[in-house]
C-alpha cells in the first residue's frame, strides 16, 4: 500500500450504522425497500406511534400466514372432529313421564280383570286331574268276566288232574304235556309252589393239625353219612382235588399229607356236592349215586331224573426213572 492511503484524515466523518427496517407497504401498495428509501447520513429518530403500528401489522400478517398453512394441512387430512354435545338427563322430566304412563295404563284396564287373569293362567298351568281308583267290587267283576271269556275259549289246556284228551281220540299237544309235567311237580313238591327253596345244610369240616406235615379231617365219616355217599368215593375226590395222598385211621379220621386249612377243604366239599349230590334238574339233595358199566349215574328221588356224572380223575403224576417211563409207554 502507498503512504498516501495510510494517512489518517481527521476531517472524515464516521459512518453510522443503518438500522434494519422491516418490510413495509406504502399506501399505494408498492413495496418499499432500503434501496427506494433515501439514504440519510444523519440519524433520524422515528416516532413511537409508527413503530407500534408496524409491529401490529407484522403480527396480523404472521397469524394469517399460520392460518393459511393450517388450512392447507387440513385439506389433506380429514375434517376436524366435531365434539358431541352431552345431553343432560333430567330426573324430574323422567318421573313425570313415568307418572303419565301409569295413568294411561290404569285408564286402559278393563272393568273385570280377574276373569282375564283366570283365562291366561288356565292356558299356561294345567290343573291336575283327580285320579279315581276303581273299587274292589269293580275289579272283581272284571276278573270274573275275563274268566268267563277264557272258559268259553276251547284251547284244550287244563290245569286239573284229568287229561284233556281222555274222552277223545285226538293226539295230545306239546303244551298239554308240558302243563301236565308242571302239575305233577307241583303236587309232589309243595315247597316249590310256595316259592320256598330247600337249603342244603351241612356241618363244617373239623380240621386239626397233626405234627408239622399232616392234617386230620376229624368228622369225615359224619359228612359222608349226611351226603349219603360212600367214604371211598368222597376220599378219592378229596385226594384228587388237593393233589395229595391220605388214608383213614382207626378213629375213622382222614389223615392227609400236607398243611391244609378249613377253608380249602370247604371249597372242595362244595364242588363235590354241586357235581355228585344235588340234582342237576331240580337242585334237590335227595339223590342216589349208582354205578353202571364203569359210569356213575345220579338219580333224583323227587323229579325222577337220571343223568350221568363225570368220573373222578386223579391229578398229574410225574413218572421218574427210566424203567417207569418204559413201562408207561408199553402200557
Curated annotation (Swiss-Prot):
UniProt GO cellular component terms: cytosol; eukaryotic translation initiation factor 2 complex; synapse
Subcellular location: Cytoplasm, Cytosol
Any Gene Ontology biological process: male germ cell proliferation
Basic and acidic residues bias locations: 40-51
Keywords: Acetylation, Cytoplasm, Initiation factor, Isopeptide bond, Metal-binding, Phosphoprotein, Protein biosynthesis, Ubl conjugation, Zinc, Zinc-finger
InterPro entries noted in UniProt: IF2/IF5, Transl_init_fac_IF2/IF5_dom, Transl_init_fac_IF2/IF5_N, Transl_init_fac_IF2/IF5_Zn-bd
Zinc finger (C4-type): 279-303
Residues where Phosphothreonine is found: 36
Record cross-link Glycyl lysine isopeptide (Lys-Gly) (interchain with G-Cter in SUMO2), residues: 102
Subunit composition and interactions: Eukaryotic translation initiation factor 2 eIF2 is a heterotrimeric complex composed of an alpha (EIF2S1), a beta (EIF2S2) and a gamma (EIF2S3) chain. eIF2 is member of the 43S pre-initiation complex (43S PIC). eIF2 forms a complex with at least CELF1/CUGBP1, CALR, CALR3, EIF2S1, EIF2S2, HSP90B1 and HSPA5. Interacts with BZW2/5MP1. Interacts with EIF5.
Function field: Component of the eIF2 complex that functions in the early steps of protein synthesis by forming a ternary complex with GTP and initiator tRNA. This complex binds to a 40S ribosomal subunit, followed by mRNA binding to form the 43S pre-initiation complex (43S PIC). Junction of the 60S ribosomal subunit to form the 80S initiation complex is preceded by hydrolysis of the GTP bound to eIF2 and release of an eIF2-GDP binary complex. In order for eIF2 to recycle and catalyze another round of initiation, the GDP bound to eIF2 must exchange with GTP by way of a reaction catalyzed by eIF2B.
The family this protein is said to belong to: Belongs to the eIF-2-beta/eIF-5 family.
Identification of the protein by name: Eukaryotic translation initiation factor 2 subunit 2
Amino acid at each position: 500500500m502507498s503512504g498516501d492511503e495510510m494517512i489518517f484524515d481527521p476531517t472524515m466523518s464516521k459512518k453510522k450504522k443503518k438500522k434494519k427496517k422491516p418490510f413495509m407497504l406504502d399506501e399505494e401498495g408498492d413495496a418499499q425497500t432500503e434501496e427506494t428509501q433515501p439514504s440519510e447520513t444523519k440519524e433520524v429518530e422515528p416516532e413511537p406511534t409508527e413503530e407500534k403500528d408496524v409491529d401490529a401489522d407484522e403480527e396480523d400478517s404472521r397469524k394469517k400466514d399460520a392460518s393459511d398453512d393450517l388450512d392447507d394441512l387440513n385439506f389433506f387430512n380429514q375434517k376436524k372432529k366435531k365434539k358431541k354435545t352431552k345431553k343432560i338427563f333430567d330426573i324430574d322430566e323422567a318421573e313425570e313421564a313415568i307418572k303419565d304412563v301409569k295413568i294411561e295404563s290404569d285408564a286402559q284396564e278393563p272393568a273385570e280383570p280377574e276373569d282375564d287373569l283366570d283365562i291366561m293362567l288356565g292356558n299356561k298351568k294345567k290343573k291336575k286331574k283327580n285320579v279315581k281308583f276303581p273299587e274292589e267290587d269293580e275289579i272283581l267283576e272284571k276278573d270274573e268276566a275275563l274268566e268267563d271269556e277264557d272258559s268259553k275259549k276251547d284251547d284244550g289246556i287244563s290245569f286239573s288232574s284229568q287229561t284233556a284228551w281222555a274222552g277223545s281220540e285226538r293226539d295230545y299237544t306239546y303244551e298239554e304235556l308240558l302243563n301236565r309235567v308242571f302239575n305233577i311237580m307241583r303236587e309232589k313238591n309243595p315247597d316249590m309252589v310256595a316259592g320256598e327253596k330247600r337249603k342244603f345244610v351241612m356241618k363244617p369240616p373239623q380240621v386239626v393239625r397233626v405234627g408239622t406235615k399232616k392234617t386230620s379231617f376229624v368228622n369225615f365219616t359224619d359228612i359222608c353219612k349226611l351226603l349219603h355217599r360212600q367214604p371211598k368215593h368222597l376220599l378219592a375226590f378229596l385226594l384228587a382235588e388237593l393233589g395229595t395222598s391220605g388214608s383213614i385211621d382207626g378213629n375213622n379220621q382222614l389223615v392227609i399229607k400236607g398243611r391244609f386249612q378249613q377253608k380249602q377243604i370247604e371249597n372242595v366239599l362244595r364242588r363235590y356236592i354241586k357235581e355228585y349230590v344235588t340234582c342237576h334238574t331240580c337242585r334237590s339233595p335227595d339223590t342216589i349215586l349208582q354205578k353202571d358199566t364203569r359210569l356213575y349215574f345220579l338219580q333224583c328221588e323227587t323229579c325222577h331224573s337220571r343223568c350221568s356224572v363225570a368220573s373222578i380223575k386223579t391229578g398229574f403224576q410225574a413218572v421218574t426213572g427210566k424203567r417207569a417211563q418204559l413201562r408207561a409207554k408199553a402200557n
